């Protein structure tokens, strides 16, 4: 997903006092890079000893974004059952890029519900959003709210709670703040446990936040993933 995952308000931004107008594909906003987003491109690929590499070239002005940019995404799998996803980008001018992947996980198998998955996210704040999913700039403390996963909790416990943020998003679609600074340190972003199968998963990242999405806008959201 790119050039920029999630929404950019009013499909525009300013760099060095110059405003760039983007493709508005989500009402008045840009979502996932617009109609020209990386998810609509045919990538080049090559096999790696332990995975696969995808590469793409995006020219200056594509989707309204400035700068020629080359991106690489590596998927690697090792003998410790660790899947790593690494994004690389190179450009020669000031621009914005915020890549992600859209992998979803259901630890009890296809067609099963995720509501009994136990989730832990070591974050005490989320980004507050508008009904159009645009961050307001405020940070909301999760304590005593449905968004508190600081202790292991079934996803379904508060999934349908009467909270405006959940109602707008048809469930969880929120950015959890893991740290306040940018660093290369890998931290645990989330851990997931499915009690029937005993399967578990830990997510690590060097980025300052993780987004929890329970696929409320999918056809069968309760059988999707997180």
Give the positions of each predicted feature.
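An exposed, glycine/acidic-rich loop-and-rim segment of catalytic or binding clefts
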Residues: 1-226
